[in-house]
């Protein structure tokens, strides 16, 4: 009886599993991959699908009305059949609104991928072939107008001289029909998305506009400049490779077979990287030690307690960034914990640490921590393997950015504080009692503030529009109060810890790791033996992870809290504080010491269960798309407790 009682007490103290830890981890990962695949297969823009179904249902009625009208006019025979077929095709094209792109954010990247792969989506400009005399005359003219580049006078074309191969302004027809005296030279505009933008349903607000170095760029002129994704071009360039294979080898197209093509690509872009990331995290969790219950809980939190699977069905930078950090952590822990000396691990750590920065710029602090830790362990290996691998990514990031924009800095570095600008312009208008005109403030260095021709409209001045970012509305106006933004980003309606309270246990765990004298698992090891050396090494690694997690948390919050008002927008309309995605792998690992203590107390275990359940609910609240407001925010708005943006 005593033995049975003792066994029961032990069962209460530390939950035990019937299966091995690794088998249970494998089951969790397989379930996650299945959920992710299901989300990808079901990807659809529900509002667009609803509109399509409605319009399709109206086609028979419209066709009947058009048929009656034609017969009343005496149209019969082949002419009648041809006209009815034309009407049907037009109605069908107008009704076809369904698409696998879920928001402006992912359409911006999809458009870049299309521009890199599809010949019909590439933007070409046609510039006049000028003589040396014309060049000299233009240089003199530009000098008189004060149009210079870094103090230098260089030849530039005026916007009205340039023809672009857009649907409403085709230079091929221009040349053949009008046969101007000048000869035009065809030149590719790399990464420009003007052509992809014109495809119905492919427009986006996450775009910038600027001219090329040999053009006079006038943002107030809708014919001047070219549209580009506002996202750094490296990630779409990498993603263009699988699409190139699908498009050129198998004949699939994002225009003709959008759902099939997008679903296949999302498996490569998101699902496979996530599966690899989960495997890497499982390996690290297993290496850090702890009870079976703790290990399974940590991995379950990383997979289901955060928003990785929420974003699996949309093209974004956060999932690849999460995967890159997870792989870099695995490689680093293999070096620091398991004593791996192969240069392959250093290359992985350096390459994926840098790639994480390419996906999420604030992850630069993570890459720096990683580099310092590896330098302290093996300086020579780090210098010869890890750092060069990271520099390859850095070089690719800069090169693709320069090819796209003709400058080293990314597009989002070329903008002003638009909300401050709006207030300034509103004040000027208020002081000018004689003016009822809307005031504008165009700046060639602000790529977000421009005039453009909306997709599907004729390229005429009466149809020109001002960019979304120059006339912000809703949540894109940003949060005026930094204190309010800090509150809602942490424990408020859109907070990291209010939506995912499991990460509160992570912060506690990081503090426990940082100040513990020895790993809990090493209490029985004797000084000087192999076990003691292993435990000491593990303690150093856990302290490093703790310091990294706490430092990065502070850096991330400081970085995003100090942005301009327009950037304090909670990541736009989305289900989570997505700016903090890079912290998720670190938060997951730092759960370990907290859960080890929770495992010994039933009440604490139930607190951990409740925190995980709440976090899972937040992550799986968005059914069809992650680009929806968090459930806490929605409940507050529905209950009249909060005014919607």
Residue ranges with predicted function:
Residues 113, 298-299, 303, 344-360, ...:
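Membrane-interface alpha helices of multi-pass inner-membrane proteins
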Residues 48-110, 115-268, 415-483, 564-568:
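Interfacial juxtamembrane loops and adjacent helix segments
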Residues 20-29, 348-351, 367-368, 387-395, ...:
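Signature aromatic-anchored transmembrane alpha helix within multi-pass, membrane-resident enzymes
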Residues 8, 12, 289, 318, ...:
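Membrane-interface transmembrane helices that cradle and orient dolichyl/undecaprenyl
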Residues 252-257, 276-304, 322-323, 342-345:
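Transmembrane-helix signature of polytopic, membrane-embedded enzymes
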Residues 334-338, 365-399, 418-419, 509-523, ...:
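Perimembrane helix-loop-helix junctions
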Residues 1-88, 266, 286-287, 381-389, ...:
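Start-transfer (signal-anchor) and selected internal transmembrane alpha helices
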């Amino acid at each position: 009886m005593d033995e049975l009682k003792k066994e029961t007490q032990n069962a209460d103290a530390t939950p035990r599993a019937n299966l091995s830890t690794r088998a249970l981890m494998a089951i969790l990962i397989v379930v996650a991959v299945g959920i992710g695949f299901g989300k990808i297969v079901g990807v659809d823009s529900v509002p667009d699908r609803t509109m399509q179904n409605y319009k399709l249902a109206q086609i028979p009625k419209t066709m009947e009305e058009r048929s009656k009208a034609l017969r009343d006019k005496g149209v019969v025979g082949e002419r009648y059949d041809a006209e009815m077929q034309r009407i049907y095709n037009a109605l069908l094209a107008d009704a076809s609104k369904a698409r696998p792109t879920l928001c402006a954010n992912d359409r911006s990247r999809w458009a870049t991928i299309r521009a890199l792969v599809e010949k019909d989506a590439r933007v070409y400009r046609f510039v006049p072939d000028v003589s040396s005399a014309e060049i000299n005359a233009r240089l003199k003219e530009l000098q008189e107008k004060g149009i210079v580049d870094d103090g230098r006078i260089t030849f530039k074309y005026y916007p009205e001289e340039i023809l672009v191969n857009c649907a409403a302004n085709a230079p091929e027809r221009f040349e053949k029909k009008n046969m101007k005296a000048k000869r035009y030279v065809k030149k590719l505009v790399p990464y420009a998305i003007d052509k992809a933008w014109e495809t119905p349903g492919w427009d986006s607000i996450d775009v910038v506009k600027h001219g090329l170095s040999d053009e006079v760029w006038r943002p107030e002129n809708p014919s001047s400049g070219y549209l580009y994704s506002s996202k750094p071009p490296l990630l779409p360039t990498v993603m263009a490779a699988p699409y190139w294979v699908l498009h050129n080898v198998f004949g699939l197209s994002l225009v003709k077979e959008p759902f099939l093509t997008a679903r296949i690509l999302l498996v490569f872009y998101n699902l496979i990287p996530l599966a690899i990331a989960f495997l890497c995290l499982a390996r690290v969790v297993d290496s850090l030690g702890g009870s079976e219950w703790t290990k399974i809980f940590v991995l379950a939190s990383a997979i289901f307690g955060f928003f990785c699977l929420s974003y699996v069905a949309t093209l974004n930078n956060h999932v690849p960034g999460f995967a890159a950090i997870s792989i870099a952590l695995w490689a680093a822990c293999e070096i620091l914990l398991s004593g791996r000396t192969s240069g392959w691990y250093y290359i992985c750590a350096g390459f994926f640490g840098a790639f994480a920065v390419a996906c999420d710029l604030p992850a630069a602090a993570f890459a720096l921590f990683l580099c310092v830790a590896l330098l302290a362990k093996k300086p020579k290996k780090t210098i010869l393997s890890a750092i060069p691998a990271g520099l390859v990514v850095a070089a690719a990031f800069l090169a693709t950015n320069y090819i796209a924009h003709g400058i080293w800095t990314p597009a989002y570095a070329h903008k002003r504080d638009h909300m401050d600008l709006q207030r300034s312009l509103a004040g000027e208008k208020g002081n000018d009692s004689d003016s009822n005109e809307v005031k504008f403030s165009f700046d060639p260095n602000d790529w977000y503030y421009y005039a453009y021709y909306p997709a599907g409209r004729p390229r005429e001045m009466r149809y020109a529009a001002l960019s979304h970012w120059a006339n912000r509305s809703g949540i894109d106006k940003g949060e005026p109060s930094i204190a309010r933004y800090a509150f809602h980003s942490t424990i408020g309606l859109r907070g990291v810890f209010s939506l995912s309270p499991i990460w509160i246990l992570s912060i506690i765990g990081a503090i426990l790791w940082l100040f513990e004298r020895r790993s809990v698992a090493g209490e029985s090891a004797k000084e000087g033996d192999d076990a003691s050396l292993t435990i000491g090494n593990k303690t150093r690694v856990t302290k490093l992870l703790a310091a990294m997690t706490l430092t990065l948390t502070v850096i991330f919050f400081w970085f995003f809290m100090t942005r301009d008002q327009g950037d304090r927008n909670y990541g736009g309309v989305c289900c989570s504080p997505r700016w903090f995605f890079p912290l998720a792998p670190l938060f997951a690992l730092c759960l370990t010491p907290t859960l080890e203590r929770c495992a010994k107390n039933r009440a604490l275990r139930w607190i951990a269960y409740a925190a995980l359940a709440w976090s899972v609910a937040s992550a799986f609240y968005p059914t069809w798309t992650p680009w929806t407001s968090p459930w806490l925010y929605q409940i507050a708005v529905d209950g009249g407790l909060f005014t919607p943006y």
